[in-house]
Swiss-Prot record:
The keyword Aminoacyl-tRNA synthetase does not apply. Belongs to the RecA family. The gene is recA. SMART domains: AAA. It is found in: Cytoplasm. Its main location: cytoplasm. GO terms for biological process: DNA recombination; DNA repair; SOS response. This is Protein RecA. Keywords: ATP-binding, Cytoplasm, DNA damage, DNA recombination, DNA repair, DNA-binding, Nucleotide-binding, SOS response. ATP binds at residues 71-78. The keyword Chaperone does not apply.
């Protein structure tokens, strides 16, 4: 028994000496023990959607992590990223938008609540330049959210300087892989959120399984803590005029909470994510708002016939909307963030949706 104690004592002493040497070589904090009090709750920034914040498990995008938002064209990828910027700015955060596509609509960003006067915008000429700018901003330690729009537009310098028909196999994937190896650690230390918007391509010759894939190789799939698949489900019409889109978002990878949650919300033109529409949808799911046929009511007060009329009522009565929202948040908190109503169907999870850890 005494021999065992002596052995354990010697092992512990050797470990303490090793830790001491590591701290002398690399500084305090380079290595530590995760004691009971050392584990803290992951800080987050809201996405602008109550349902998506709940599905993510921690109330929004985790700080100090890399996020990927991908989907087809005009599905709401940039809109969601701009909402995150707006939410961060409300808390006094500094945000940057790396517009590699050279297509940022400043007027639309303002309508979503972005303070464009304080927004840092860059329109880089090459992929290398864009990623260097991202690195410098993160290393400043003063940035909270950086959005790169998009990965597909991060064109390597060799491709730009070459002829139009030249083949450059894997250049972009190698560029992104090299950059992410450097960025992943400094993003964590700076406690900022780095959001990559990505496009979808089709794999040639795929007979079985999902032919869709994202650009930039596999590195971003591995380094991302959260990956969101955003899709346009249907058009929202006012008579014959399309005024928005019903959007579906699936959390296909999540390192901070259980993945495979799925949410729906409305994205209205010139407005962004419809908060009142989401309040109605979640209120119905949680039995806070009553729905009988096409009529919506709350506390025996009829909100309107049809969802658009109910949304109009809540816009004109913000106190009622706030009251319903508070009840929704309280209900979700009381159920310990039980988001079983947002679970995606197993059959709908495609090959591309399987998370990469």
């Amino acid at each position: 028994m005494s021999d065992t104690k002596n052995l354990n004592h010697d092992r512990q002493k050797a470990l303490d000496n090793a830790i001491s040497q590591i701290e002398k070589a690399f500084g305090r904090g380079a290595i530590m023990k995760l004691k009971q009090g050392a584990i803290e709750k992951i800080d987050s920034i809201p996405t602008g959607s109550i349902a998506l914040d709940t599905a993510l498990g921690i109330g929004g995008f985790p700080k100090g992590r890399i996020i990927e938002i991908f989907g087809p064209e005009s599905s709401g990828k940039t809109t969601l990223a701009l909402h995150v910027i707006a939410e961060s700015q409300k808390k006094g955060g500094n945000c940057a938008f790396i517009d590699a596509e050279h297509a940022l609509d400043i007027m639309y960003a303002r309508k979503l609540g972005v303070n464009t006067g304080d927004l840092i915008v860059s329109q880089p000429d090459t992929g290398e330049q864009a990623l260097h700018i991202v690195e410098y901003l993160i290393c400043s330690g003063a940035i909270d959210v950086i959005v790169v729009d998009s990965v597909a537009a991060l064109t390597p310098r060799a491709e730009i300087e070459g002829d139009m028909g030249d083949q450059h196999m894997g250049l972009q994937a190698r560029l992104l892989s090299h950059a992410l190896r450097k960025l992943t650690s400094i993003v964590s230390k700076a406690n900022c959120i780095l959001i990559f918007i990505n496009q979808i391509r089709m794999k040639i010759g795929v007979v079985y399984g999902n032919p869709e894939t994202t650009t930039g190789g596999n590195a971003l799939k591995f380094y991302s803590s959260v990956r969101l698949d955003i899709r346009k489900v249907s058009a929202i019409k006012d008579k014959d005029v399309i005024i928005g889109n019903q959007t579906k978002v699936k959390v296909v990878k999540n390192k901070v909470a259980p993945p495979f949650k799925q949410v729906d919300f409305d994205i209205m033109y010139n407005e962004g994510i419809s908060k009142v529409g989401e309040i109605i949808d979640m209120g119905v799911k949680l039995n806070i708002v009553e729905k009988a046929g096409s009529y919506y009511s709350y506390n025996s007060v009829r909100l309107g016939q049809g969802k658009e009329n109910a949304k109009l009522y809540l816009k004109n009565n913000p106190s009622t909307a706030d009251e319903i929202e508070q009840k929704i948040r309280a209900s979700l908190q009381a159920s310990d963030n039980d988001v079983s109503c947002f679970n995606a169907e197993v059959d709908s999870i495609s090959d591309m949706d399987v998370p990469v850890f």
